Curated annotation (Swiss-Prot):
It holds the Pfam family Pribosyltran. Homodimer. Orotate binds at T137. It comes from Rhizobium meliloti (strain 1021). The lineage of its organism: Bacteria, Pseudomonadati, Pseudomonadota, Alphaproteobacteria, Hyphomicrobiales. One of its GO terms (molecular function) is orotate phosphoribosyltransferase activity. This is Orotate phosphoribosyltransferase.
Length: 232
């Protein structure tokens, strides 16, 4: 169970950023940009799935996730924790254990045989469900799972991402307009701040990353990626 130690939010963000650098989950590559699934060109890439392979780090991150939810959403607001296929599943299991709640997971699509289920596990009608993902850019992938839960009779008013890109100012407002408050621990700003503090890259690379964070679609367009993107 969660220890109820409520670390300061800024401290949690900085520590998670440092942990992500420590396990080499973060990559900066301004001279040869990554191409994201959205079509955007990006000088940054993160693999939060690596967290599951580092027990001490994953334990700390999940403690921070529990603290974030209890502080920002409340102690008795949820009946079930849900993770999306596949990256969200292990984090849902760990967060559910800390919060003392049941867990379900949501497939990207019904499995197509047997019960043709999209939701695995037991979710009572009207259950208040907390959805967790390892990371989110604008909430689009999270809403695929939220829509499935709502269609099955669950109530979703909160989602949490361990890492939030925080590059589109309208993203959280869009989620709020659909009835969901987004919570998160760390962002690219935290990761960049640690990179500067520890001098992990040359100044040119750091400045390019900051330029991307300030105007991601402009940066993408200048570097061969899409110049427009519907933030849903």
């Amino acid at each position: 169970m969660f220890s109820n130690a409520f670390t300061d939010k800024a401290v949690m963000a900085e520590l998670v950023a440092k942990m992500l650098w420590e396990i080499k989950a973060v990559h900066f590559r301004a001279d040869e940009p990554y191409r994201l699934a959205s079509g955007m060109a990006s000088p940054v890439y993160i693999d939060c799935r690596k967290l599951v392979s580092y027990p001490r780090i994953r334990s700390a991150v999940m403690d921070f996730a529990a603290a974030t939810i209890l502080r920002e959403a409340g102690f008795e607001q949820f009946d079930v924790v849900a993770g999306g296929e596949t990256a969200g599943i292990p984090f849902a299991a760990m967060l559910a254990e800390r919060l003392g709640l049941p867990m379900i997971y949501v497939r990207k699509a019904p499995k197509g045989h047997g019960r043709n289920a999209q939701i695995e596990g037991y979710m009572p009608e009207g259950a208040r469900v907390l959805v967790i993902e390892d990371l989110t850019t604008a909430g689009g992938s999270m809403f695929k799972f939220i829509d499935a839960i709502r269609a099955a009779g669950g109530v979703v008013e909160h989602g949490i991402a361990l890492f939030y890109y925080d590059i589109f100012p309208e993203a959280r407002g869009n989620m709020k307009s659909k009835g969901v408050d987004l919570h998160y621990i760390a962002t690219w700003r935290n990761v960049l701040a640690v990179a500067r503090e520890l001098a992990l890259f040359d100044e040119k690379t750091l400045n390019e990353v900051e330029a991307f964070l300030n105007a991601p679609l402009d940066w993408s367009g200048r570097n061969g990626g899409v110049r427009a993107l519907a933030v849903q």
